[in-house]
Design a protein with these regions (language model features):
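Hydrophobic alpha-helical segments within soluble ligand-binding/sensing domains
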Residues: 125-128
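Short glycine-enriched, charge-decorated loop/helix-capping segments at active-site entrances
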Residues: 116-122, 161-164
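Nucleotide and nucleotide-moiety/phosphate-recognizing core
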Residues: 2-120, 130-144, 151-156, 171-202
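A hydrophobic, small-residue-rich beta->alpha segment in the mid-to-C-terminal subdomain
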Residues: 167-168
């Protein structure tokens, strides 16, 4: 407990840099697909923060202040399979540590409606995460896993992730995106451990 309290003091009184990486694919044909939920969360985060996007090297880029911290948000334009190229470039440019970088990603392994932050983990077959692992030095980076479930016939995984959310899911999306933003804001404000305890959903 003293250690957590000390960490909270650091978060409140030291200016820190954070990078939020929403994963997805560029192009109208990919808009509103399950695989692009990282882009959707990033878009809403930037909108609510009264920031705006600029098209820069390897990514759409936005920035804003939150409780004195610098928060940078990117949507890689490298396509999913080269997401690590954009993330590594902007980590270096902005001098953001891997511990302060949050990747927002769709996750087949957890049910739709489940939102879980974790400090590290495997790529679990996700090409965007594989690229990040290969380019950014391993598996020890925070990620926000947005559950999309695995309700698809055998052999149709690609069609499923590149397809739109169904009508019932679309009704729930605004609330889930809103909760995702609260998780990101909490990550910036009080750190990953307390955010996991307070805001992860099953």
């Amino acid at each position: 407990m003293p250690f957590l309290f000390y960490n909270q003091i650091i978060f409140y009184f030291c200016t820190m840099n954070f990078l939020i990486v929403g994963l997805g694919d560029i192009g109208k044909e990919y808009e509103d697909t399950r695989h692009n939920i990282g882009f959707m969360v990033a878009d809403q985060l930037v909108k609510e923060s009264n920031a705006s996007w600029s098209l820069l090297k390897h990514a759409y880029y936005a920035e804003f202040k939150q409780r004195g911290h610098n928060v940078y948000v990117i949507k890689p334009t490298t396509y999913m399979n080269l997401s690590g190229k954009a993330m590594n470039y902007w980590m270096q440019q902005l001098k953001v540590s891997i511990e302060n970088t949050m990747v927002v990603v769709d996750d087949l392994a957890i049910p739709f409606g489940s939102l879980r932050i974790k400090p590290k983990g495997s790529a679990a077959g996700h090409n965007g995460l594989r690229s990040i692992e290969a380019t950014c030095g391993g598996q020890n980076y925070p990620r926000l896993r947005f559950g999309i479930g695995d309700n698809y016939p055998k052999g149709r995984q690609v069609d499923f992730v590149l397809g739109p959310f169904d009508k019932d899911e679309q009704k729930d999306l605004p609330a889930l995106i809103d909760h995702s933003i609260k998780m990101i804001q909490s990550f910036v404000n009080i750190g990953i451990e307390l955010t996991m305890t307070n805001l992860n959903t099953k």
